[in-house]
Regions:
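A structural-propensity feature for long, helix-poor, extended segments
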Residues: 41, 45-84
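Conserved phosphate/anionic-ligand binding catalytic regions in large, soluble enzymes, centered on
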Residues: 8-26
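A conserved regulatory-domain signal marking ACT and ACT-like small-molecule sensing domains
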Residues: 91-94, 118-225
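Protein-protein interaction/assembly regions in multi-subunit complexes
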Residues: 25, 67-70, 75-76, 84-86, ...
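Contiguous domain-boundary segments centered on the initiation and propagation of an alpha-helix
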Residues: 66-116
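Non-transmembrane, aqueous-exposed alpha-helical and coiled segments at domain scale
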Residues: 32-41, 101
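Short, hydrophobic/aliphatic alpha-helical segments
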Residues: 1-10, 40-42
Length: 225
């Protein structure tokens, strides 16, 4: 435990779980969509559903979808900012089985029709855990730089990606492989110690068998004062 676990994050709003964590969940959805969200359906579970509006959870999630960090002074005005940005959204309640009480499910779509469904929980102190991506079970926190690689479930895809990362001297901190079924589409979630540059992400996306690569840059939040 460090001092930030005790004091919590720098943020706007009354609750690190309901506001800071919610903003990070929204921003994670935006980042992994890989484009500007134009439509969003936000579903709140448990404590998020019961007290989320009063604690500003709904505004924080929308703020994250707009690219705001937890300390952004515009968070209380996120609904107005969404209208300016052309982001159409709905917020409702959902009852999930075996989910953390501070859980949100976000379905987002960009102007080109690209879609993403993300389920994540705010676990305290502004920290989050992503539990599902497009219905596939995952587990990552956003505490590391994170690559999400969608690929055909075939021999060589994992080796190709990890070989390139090794050549770039990028150390893998954690990695998980997830799939619906053998031979279908799969997900690699790769958390790294080092920053990955935009052109390097693009190169990985061109590898055989790779469907898409999105990248969550932890440094984007670390640089916020």
């Amino acid at each position: 435990m460090d001092i930030f676990d005790i004091l919590g994050p720098v943020m706007v709003g009354p609750s690190s779980s309901h506001t800071a964590g919610a903003a990070r969940i929204g921003k994670m959805a935006r980042t992994l969509l890989g484009g500007e969200p134009m439509e969003a359906r936000i579903h709140l579970h448990g404590s998020f559903a019961e007290t989320g509006s009063g604690h500003g959870t709904d505004r924080a999630l929308v703020a994250g979808l707009l690219g705001m960090n937890p300390d952004d002074m515009r968070i209380p005005f996120a609904f107005q900012e969404a209208e300016k940005a052309g982001l159409h959204f709905t917020v409702d309640k959902i009852d999930l089985r075996d989910a953390h009480p501070n859980t949100a499910v976000i379905e987002v779509r960009d102007a080109h029709g690209k879609q993403l469904e993300l389920q994540a929980a705010s676990i305290g102190g502004g920290r989050i855990v992503v539990n599902k991506l497009d219905g596939i079970d995952v587990s990552f926190t956003g505490d590391y730089n994170t690559l999400v690689v969608r690929n055909h479930d075939e021999n060589g895809a994992l080796a190709a990606v990890t070989t390139i990362l090794s050549q770039l001297r990028i150390n893998v901190a954690n990695m998980s492989l997830c799939r619906h079924k053998r031979g279908g589409d799969a997900l690699m979630v790769i958390e790294t110690d080092q920053h990955i540059k935009t052109h390097q992400v693009s190169f990985l996306a061109e590898l055989p068998g790779i469907l898409s690569v999105t990248y969550y840059d932890k440094e984007d939040e670390d640089h916020v004062s």
